[in-house]
Regions:
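Terminal substrate-recognition subdomain of acyl/acetyltransferases
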Residues: 2-3, 10-15, 30, 119, ...
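Short loop segments at secondary-structure junctions
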Residues: 57-61, 100-101, 171-176
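Conserved acetyl-CoA-binding loop-helix of GNAT-fold acetyltransferases
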Residues: 97, 103-116
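Conserved GNAT acetyl-CoA-binding A-motif
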Residues: 116-130
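Conserved alpha-helical elements of the SDR catalytic core
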Residues: 74, 114, 134
Length: 204
């Protein structure tokens, strides 16, 4: 039997204006406390996704249109460790399922797909920031809270105040997550390419 709601993995460069509009409508419905955040674009701390995992419900009728019912975006961040090693990591953003389709396992399927794709692209780690009530959900999926501080920085090298203040990580290979405090940057801010250079040499 065919999956009634198949998952799609879309690179940002194939998401046209129509799909982008539907995604933003979905995000606005799922995050009503941020009504203006997705009005014009899908950007998380000044970065667009590298790819997005979607679930769409096919609309019936000649004039119908597909409805986005599930979404996970993956933005590429650079994490810098105490020892000044830098890694590009897959940052999970906008995990959301339309209200009528929650508690069906779609969120878990989308996150798994997003991590599989990050692994396929060569990333060593995935990171996310979530609110405290969601920590048990992610822990059940193998995510871990960091033992040390994680600070995200903006383009002016000022720390960003995070509304979702529980940093978590997943190891995508057998390489352990770096120990000690971690800084999170826009890749270009610290001289890393968004696409490629999954692991850099030590920065002197």
């Amino acid at each position: 039997m065919n999956d009634p709601y198949p998952l799609e993995t879309l690179d940002e460069n194939v998401i046209d204006a129509a799909i982008d509009s539907r995604i933003r409508e979905h995000l606005t419905r799922c995050f009503p406390d941020s009504p203006d955040k997705f009005r014009e674009h899908r950007i998380w701390h000044n970065l667009s996704p590298e790819y997005t995992v979607l679930v769409r419900r096919q609309a019936g009728g000649a004039n119908g249109r597909d409805l986005i019912i599930g979404h996970v975006a993956v933005v590429i961040r650079t994490i810098t460790t105490t020892w000044n090693w830098r890694y590009n990591a897959a940052s999970i953003q906008g995990v959301s399922v339309a209200e009528d389709f929650r508690h069906t396992g779609l969120a878990v399927q989308m996150i798994d797909r997003a991590l599989d794709e990050a692994r396929r692209r060569g990333y060593l780690y995935a990171v996310l920031f979530c609110k405290e009530p969601f920590v048990p959900f992610y822990e059940n999926l193998g995510w871990r809270l960091t033992d040390d501080s994680v600070v995200m920085w903006n383009e002016q090298d000022s720390p960003i105040t995070m509304r979702s203040n529980c940093p978590m990580y997943r190891e995508l290979t057998d390489k352990p997550f770096p120990e000690g405090p971690v800084d999170v940057h826009n890749p270009e801010q610290v001289g890393m390419k968004k696409n490629g250079n999954r692991e850099s040499d030590e920065v002197k």
